[in-house]
Amino acid sequence: MEAMAVFSGSNLFATSSLLLTTNSKTRYSQLRTTQNLSAFSSKSHLFSPSSTSSSYPKTFRTRSSTESGIFLPRLITSLEQVDQAYIMVKPDGVQRGLVGEIISRFEKKGFKLTGLKLFQCSKELAEEHYKHLNQKSFFPKLIEYITSGPVVSMAWEGVGVVPSARKLIGATDPLQAEPGTIRGDFAVQTGRNIIHGSDSPENGEREIALWFKEGELCEWTPVQEPWLRE
């Protein structure tokens, strides 16, 4: 026991010195590791200007002429003419429950609905709408048909809405209308051809002004608009 105590005592100072040296190296290694892990300030962000080394000069990137050309199609698209079309579901289309189907086809095409109402058309309004046909032998029968029940008046808006609407609707004579068109799919006779659509942008504006009063149209922006055109 005494021998062991003497041996331990003789080496006590050396052992203590070794432990102190080892602990110092460990703390120094931990300190360097912590400093390396803390390269970014706690208040900084990897993508913020403060995270950029001050030894590198800051530069500002300007758009080149070749890059600006990418946006030219968008500029052209923004200048495209947005037209209006008046679409009316006639009494037979309303009675047959085709209003939803017709609206769906125009919506799926990407056009914007700005006016919609269901009402009973008066004789005076029908005669004004079809005044270009007042010399035709079928005119009285046409007026009787349009006023025989409620109609659904719609105002649609979009680039090329008038010619596109005519294609969606189909030929006046349902027997000549292509399959896939509204008249081609749902009508069989000219006297019951379900739907009316403006035949020109000018008539579209005129008919909308005739069938809708001031304040009845709604101006809005569909969320799908950026996905319709470049």
UniProtKB/Swiss-Prot annotation:
The biological process GO terms on file are:
CTP biosynthetic process; GTP biosynthetic process; UTP biosynthetic process
GO function terms (MF aspect): ATP binding; metal ion binding; nucleoside diphosphate kinase activity
Q: What Gene3D superfamilies has UniProt attached to this entry?
A: Nucleoside diphosphate kinase-like domain
The record's listing under Pfam families reads:
NDK (PF00334)
> What range is the organelle transit peptide?
1-64
Query: Would you tell me the Gene Ontology cellular component terms?
Result: chloroplast
| UniProt xrefs under PROSITE patterns | NDPK (PS00469), NDPK_LIKE (PS51374)
Query: Might you give the EC number(s) for this enzyme?
Result: 2.7.4.6
What residues form the catalytic site here?
H196
Subcellular location per UniProt equals: Plastid, Chloroplast
Highest taxon in the source lineage:
Eukaryota
Keyword flag Nucleotide-binding: yes
Q: Which cofactor does it need?
A: Mg(2+)
Please list the reactions this protein catalyses.
a 2'-deoxyribonucleoside 5'-diphosphate + ATP = a 2'-deoxyribonucleoside 5'-triphosphate + ADP; a ribonucleoside 5'-diphosphate + ATP = a ribonucleoside 5'-triphosphate + ADP
Keywords for this protein: ATP-binding, Chloroplast, Kinase, Magnesium, Metal-binding, Nucleotide metabolism, Nucleotide-binding, Phosphoprotein, Plastid, Transferase, Transit peptide
Which residues take part in binding ATP?
K90, F138, R166, T172, R183, N193
What family does the Swiss-Prot or TrEMBL record give for this protein? Belongs to the NDK family.
Record NCBIfam families: PRK00668.1
HAMAP family to which the protein is assigned, alphabetical: NDP_kinase
Q: What does this protein do?
A: Major role in the synthesis of nucleoside triphosphates other than ATP. The ATP gamma phosphate is transferred to the NDP beta phosphate via a ping-pong mechanism, using a phosphorylated active-site intermediate.
Q: What is this protein called?
A: Nucleoside diphosphate kinase 2, chloroplastic
Please name the source species.
Answer: Pisum sativum
